[in-house]
Amino acid sequence: MRLNELTLQHYRNYETVSLDFPKTLNLFLGENAQGKTNLLESIYVLAMTRSHRTSNEKELIGWEQAAAKISGVVEKKTGTVPLEILISNKGRKTKVNHIEQKRLSAYIGQLNVILFAPEDLSLVKGSPQVRRKFIDMELGQVSPIYLYDLVQYQSVLKQRNQYLKQLAEKKQTDTVYLDILTEQLAEFGGKVLYARLGFLKKLEHWANLLHQKISHGRETLTIDYASSIPIDNTDLSLEALQNQLLQQLMNNRKRELFKANTFLGPHRDDLLFIVNGQNVQTYGSQGQQRTTALSIKLAEIDLMHSETGEYPVLLLDDVMSELDNERQIHLLETIEGKVQTFLTTTSLDHIKDKLTVEPDIFYVQQGKIERNSAT
């Protein structure tokens, strides 16, 4: 999978920009606050429909403009696919092959991307919310069914919490409707949990291979799923997970009615990264934490390829400066030649000697971009 063309109109500090990307490695060079990250963000938004940096979509629209538009041409094994997303105060509109898409699950997955930014190093030591978002975004790209189930789960969860609040405030007394919402939550929650467990097993395989390589065989990485409900590892069938979640929700109802909140389910779960038998978040060194984060992010490349038959597009936002020399080499060895990569940096000095393929270099200054292929 490749992004062959990208056009921005009134996106952040870009008035109008049109670029083509014939090469596998694309470097965006410039000082800070010139628009490098905005460019990578636009590719991410084109793929995922949302920014990874802000939930306020107005920030994506250029100053005194009514809307921003991102369009691109994606090349797959099956042919080229034009994509477009229009962002305005009225919301977002997405198009595939010039046809508007009504459902998110019909759009996401047309362009698969992996973003690696300095903040992704907090994947290991950050909050559980960071890790839940990670698995939801990555799994959602390769499985439209998961994305649908997740959206349904979140919708029912919101309704259930609202109804719990109404019951707590005595505005409602009918618990039959709560039973219905609880059954729906267990149905979709079980599906989300089932998909996550399967995905993590595959991710662990690829991540451990990379982690052992980076650590020269000294460390083994495993990933544990920390569920908010007890899980019987002898029966991880969809039906068993749904029944267990339903039973735990029913058992916890008194507390939920008192607190007017849902305390159990995939929205409360977490991931644990275990290196040589110890939780790296708690006991790992900074080096181990960074190796783990790098292994997890790079593992997504092979995992997405195995799931979709296509390599994703890799977005590296000023991450090279956060990695030591050895980890930089492992990263570049993993991606070069097989993964189209967009990399931002303020200087080429620390990476130019490690490159084995000739990149396209784009100079970014105040929302203007100039190409120069010479290194």
From Swiss-Prot:
Residues that, per the record, bind ATP: 30-37
GO biological process: DNA replication; DNA synthesis involved in DNA repair; double-strand break repair; SOS response
Gene Ontology MF annotations: ATP binding; single-stranded DNA binding
Compartment(s): Cytoplasm
Gene3D superfamilies reported in the protein's UniProt record: P-loop containing nucleotide triphosphate hydrolases, RecF/RecN/SMC, N-terminal domain
Signal peptide span: none
Any single Gene Ontology cellular-component annotation: cytoplasm
Main location: cytoplasm
Domain of life: Bacteria
Keywords linked to the UniProt accession: ATP-binding, Cytoplasm, DNA damage, DNA repair, DNA replication, DNA-binding, Nucleotide-binding, SOS response
InterPro entries found in the cross-reference section: DNA-binding_RecF, DNA-binding_RecF_CS, P-loop_NTPase, RecF/RecN/SMC_N, RecF_2
Functional note: The RecF protein is involved in DNA metabolism; it is required for DNA replication and normal SOS inducibility. RecF binds preferentially to single-stranded, linear DNA. It also seems to bind ATP.
PANTHER family linked to this entry: DNA REPLICATION AND REPAIR PROTEIN RECF (PTHR32182:SF0)
Family as reported in the entry's similarity comment: Belongs to the RecF family.
This protein's name: DNA replication and repair protein RecF
Organism: Enterococcus faecalis (strain ATCC 700802 / V583)
Gene symbol of the encoding locus: recF
